[in-house]
């Protein structure tokens, strides 16, 4: 009862804080100069991170197993991982714009996880026999860590494409669409150009030079982050194969989740392979990574919507009225 009450309090604190952060985020989209509000948003995200950490620890202690048994718990863990990825660049360099990319994903994931749509999964339950294994923490945590990392890397590639081609399509016009501002792509370009201008006041630099520098930097970031995510995904799939052999007597069953995990792995393998070809670096490889962003969400969330296959434990269902 104590742990259930604590989890309830931490969840409400997290949801309330993230709601305030979303409001601040929307305000700063309209008024870029409100530096104080942006700092308040970062403090709110830190408070939410500690609330999530407290929730995960409480759920782990009360249930006796690592909290990854259903979609609700995995979403909480995914948002917790995104918070870490959001924080690391700021610790290394307070002016690193990589954290700017992760902000919307972190906010939206946590907002959905703590909303009322997953109320039926809020209560901790006893694991089904197939999940009562030490492989649960190893396999699922590796998969979620890889998803979070690959999502960030894919967003960096998407930012590269949008910044490079935004003038070619009316859809990406800042005057007509708030899409760029919502995901901070224009903010990155603005901050980078401003910072470069301060460093190069002794001689004139053309705007296209800032654009070139920024896209090259995004390309480098994307490659590094996706390489890490691909490694984690490979380890996660291998752990899952070993666990499947112990539980079901077969390393691979072409279950829908397994099939889409293989598709995800293939997409990012193609991305990494394309990086070895100089002609495919930059725009072409970024396009592959951007496709991977959608594939990850299908693999992770889309399959849970269907609730089919061997990986249907804790699948998503709409609350009944």
Curated annotation (Swiss-Prot):
A GO cellular-component term linked to this record: chloroplast thylakoid membrane
Localization: Plastid, Chloroplast thylakoid membrane
Keywords, comma-separated and alphabetical: Chloroplast, Cytochrome c-type biogenesis, Membrane, Plastid, Thylakoid, Transmembrane, Transmembrane helix
GO molecular function, one term: heme binding
Transmembrane segments: 9-29, 44-64, 68-88, 143-163, 225-245, 259-273, 288-308
Membrane topology label: Multi-pass membrane protein
Parts forming coiled coils: none
GO biological process, one term: cytochrome complex assembly
Chief location bin: plastid
Pfam families per record: Cytochrom_C_asm
InterPro entries according to UniProt: Cyt_c_assembly, Cyt_c_biogenesis_CcsA, Cyt_c_biogenesis_CcsA/CcmC
Keyword Transmembrane attached: yes
Family: Belongs to the CcmF/CycK/Ccl1/NrfE/CcsA family.
Subunit structure as annotated in this protein's UniProt entry: May interact with Ccs1.
Entry function: Required during biogenesis of c-type cytochromes (cytochrome c6 and cytochrome f) at the step of heme attachment.
Name of the protein in question: Cytochrome c biogenesis protein CcsA
Organism: Sorghum bicolor
Underlying gene: ccsA
